[in-house]
Amino acid sequence: MSLFDPHLDGASLGKVAVLMGGVSAEREVSLLSGAGVLRALRARAVDAHAFDTAQGDLGALKREGYARCFIALHGRHGEDGTVQGALELLGIAYTGSGVMASSMALDKTMSKRIWRSEGLPTPDWRLVTSGAEAGQALQTLGAPMIVKPAREGSTIGLSKVHQAQQCASAYLLAARYDPEVLCEQFIAGDELTCTVLDQGRRASAQALPLIRIVAPDGNYDYQHKYFSDATRYHCPSGLPEAQERAIGRLAEQAFSALGCRGWARADIMLRASDQQPFLLEINTAPGMTDHSLVPMSARAAGISYEDLCLRLLAMATLDTPPGALSGAARA
């Protein structure tokens, strides 16, 4: 498969801002992602500059002549459509999904509703507003149960609840990060992740090789995701070829159902009892650190980190073509 144009000239892409940092709970990871992307783009002759959205005025991007933005922000106010909307108003092309798809993908409840409406498998869930409601959800969904913020990533604020007396503290932890708290049926089995790369406006998205994740005691938390060497990543996944293709198609369908573009990473559980895959969430601005999964999957497909970053940047675009809104206003 050809996922990269070897003749792409990084110097032709103009002045580029790598948006990183931000104000979400994932700021630390975003800074690591942004630093890696910045090095990669500069290695491909791109005129790239770091831009911490927590410290800079986005309006400066227009004033200082930036042509494109690589979004290396994670979580709220970076991956949820807010920055994308600002860049739409500024008329500056950006990487990844547009305003609506970004917003829906970060909101786990909304993405699960859309997937369910499309007939795509996702664990049962309940949206709760108190510890008492979380306890009621446990009775319905069964133990163990996952309690997490509806609009955060990197397993921040997530708890695995086994007993009713744990529900109140699990709810309070999740509510520290988001007033919308999601209780989700726990799926026992292997955790998989699948990167999806857009092939351009006239071609379909394509899944890269799956990664099977084996964390100590099955606990793939924030520390194990980004800073631990104890987690084991299997790529190739070791699954039968036909099963891997089917799960890749599921990730592509999840990507399409939300209207994503550019790239994303779908997180999937493979139920041990019957090998049924379940969609957990999709990340529209995935991590790009040295522990991150997208670069690992890309390498398995023959795409280097530097070439991946350059390809994503070259695909930067806008929901609304430049001049379309001003033309409508004149009409």
UniProtKB/Swiss-Prot annotation:
Superkingdom field: Bacteria
InterPro entries noted in UniProt: ATP-grasp, ATP_grasp_subdomain_1, D-Ala_lig_Van_CS, D_ala_D_ala, Dala_Dala_lig_C, Dala_Dala_lig_N, PreATP-grasp_dom_sf
Keyword Protein biosynthesis (UniProt): no
Keyword Metal-binding recorded: yes
Enzyme Commission identifier(s): 6.3.2.4
Co-factor binding details: Binds 2 magnesium or manganese ions per subunit.
Binding site for Mg(2+) 1: D267, E281
Cofactor: Mg(2+); Mn(2+)
GO CC terms of this entry: cytosol
Catalytic activity: 2 D-alanine + ATP = D-alanyl-D-alanine + ADP + phosphate + H(+)
Residues that bind ATP: 138-193
Ranges where the ATP-grasp domain occurs: 112-314
SUPFAM superfamilies: Glutathione synthetase ATP-binding domain-like, PreATP-grasp domain
Pathway assigned in UniProt: Cell wall biogenesis; peptidoglycan biosynthesis
Main localization, broad class: cytoplasm
A GO MF term: ATP binding
BP terms from Gene Ontology: cell wall organization; peptidoglycan biosynthetic process; regulation of cell shape
Entry's localization field: Cytoplasm
Alphabetical keyword list: ATP-binding, Cell shape, Cell wall biogenesis/degradation, Cytoplasm, Ligase, Magnesium, Manganese, Metal-binding, Nucleotide-binding, Peptidoglycan synthesis
EC top class named in words: ligase
PANTHER family in the record: D-ALANINE--D-ALANINE LIGASE, D-ALANINE--D-ALANINE LIGASE B
Role this protein plays: Cell wall formation.
Similarity field: Belongs to the D-alanine--D-alanine ligase family.
Protein name (record): D-alanine--D-alanine ligase
Organism: Verminephrobacter eiseniae (strain EF01-2)
